[in-house]
Amino acid sequence: MQVLVALAALSSLAAPVVGFSIPRGVPVSQSMIDVKLSSAGNSMVKATITNNGDRALNLLKFHTIMDSNPTRKVSIESQDGKEVQFTGMMPRYKNTDLKPTYFMSLPPKGTVEHSFDIAATHDLSRGGQFTLKAEGMVPIAEENSTNITGAAQYHSNELHMTIDGDQAASVKSAIGVAKRDGPFTRIDKRTKIDMQSCGNRQELQALTAALSASAKLSSMSAQAVGQNQQKYMEYFKDPKYAKTVQSRFQAVAKESSSTNNGGTTYFCSDVMGGCEEGVLAYTLPSRNQVYNCPIYYSELPPLTKECHAQDQATTTLHELTHNPAVQEPFCEDNGYGYERATALSAEKAVQNADSYALFANAVYVGC
């Protein structure tokens, strides 16, 4: 891994489509909300979300089709059946102390529209015909509440679009040029870190410690895959994927331990401007880059001893699984938090970033 440290002060600006952390035992509705996709221009998509119920709902926007961040809101296939490369961000959100601004209120039988340009987060420069669809789970709270009481699954219609490649290529990328107010210094050896290259010594120390802890947790987890079948089955469901899971943990351990030979670049600050409120860290898988956000340092402990909780070490581990340079295919955000992650099918779990972070936490804490 290559760690780059920005001299600039941290900037704070405002994923695949998945559910957030759902408390154990809460109901999941198959038909509470409806999502319909329609074309709104060359590469513009309009999602119409309808509350089919008879009571108002607060819908958590994180990791859903309503997310304001440039996450993967829809899956896109070209006319030859190949998945279109995603060029947006995969954020990890803080899953506690949810604020009212993280939610969207929807009255009974009410409808809200959310439009987004898929060319801002996908390479559509070839143009042609594309097929889009959206599916996922939206955590829900009662009206005027942020207490998650249930979840609503959704499966949209298939939308077929004919896109002009040149016009799509002219759309500005949602994650663009790094916002650098000063030069970067590459850290070639952790034992020889130039502390003057970082504007905040404490943050650099925290990141370095998190990488070290990520390496240790990943190594422990790789061993646990073969030694603790009960725990493995809790998270990954099928023993036929054990070698894949073990291999990914070993790859993350190697990447976390590397100083200048890894395939990823890890930034201790948000030079790309992707840290909206609630984002702990995020990955740009198309670039194999990871960025920490201010609350990664201010609101996460280095290494928690609480089951299913978030910390700096497992957040770093989580983000590294999103990078194709670590292991391909890279992990998605199929299920967020313990309840959703452990409810996934084996096929989804083995490609879910939080399943690896939560398993590592469970192995370390002894959950």
UniProtKB/Swiss-Prot annotation:
Catalytic site positions: E319
Propeptide residues, chain positions: 20-190
InterPro entries noted in UniProt: Fungal_M35_metalloproteases (IPR050414), MetalloPept_cat_dom_sf (IPR024079), Peptidase_M35 (IPR001384)
Cofactors (names): Zn(2+)
S-S pairs: C198-C268, C275-C293, C307-C367
Catalytic activity: Preferential cleavage of bonds with hydrophobic residues in P1'. Also 3-Asn-|-Gln-4 and 8-Gly-|-Ser-9 bonds in insulin B chain
Binding site for Zn(2+): H318, H322, D333
Cofactor, how bound (note): Binds 1 zinc ion per subunit.
Domain of life: Eukaryota
UniProtKB keywords: Cleavage on pair of basic residues, Disulfide bond, Hydrolase, Metal-binding, Metalloprotease, Protease, Secreted, Signal, Virulence, Zinc, Zymogen
Entry GO CC: extracellular region
Signal peptide: 1-19
Subcellular location, record wording: Secreted
EC numbers: 3.4.24.39
GO molecular function: metal ion binding; metalloendopeptidase activity
PROSITE patterns: ZINC_PROTEASE (PS00142)
Single GO BP term: proteolysis
PANTHER family noted in UniProt: NEUTRAL PROTEASE 2-RELATED (PTHR37016:SF3), PTHR37016
Family membership: Belongs to the peptidase M35 family.
Function in brief: Probable secreted metalloprotease that shows high activities on basic nuclear substrates such as histone and protamine. May be involved in virulence.
The protein's name: Probable neutral protease 2 homolog MCYG_00239
Lineage of origin: Eukaryota, Fungi, Dikarya, Ascomycota, Pezizomycotina
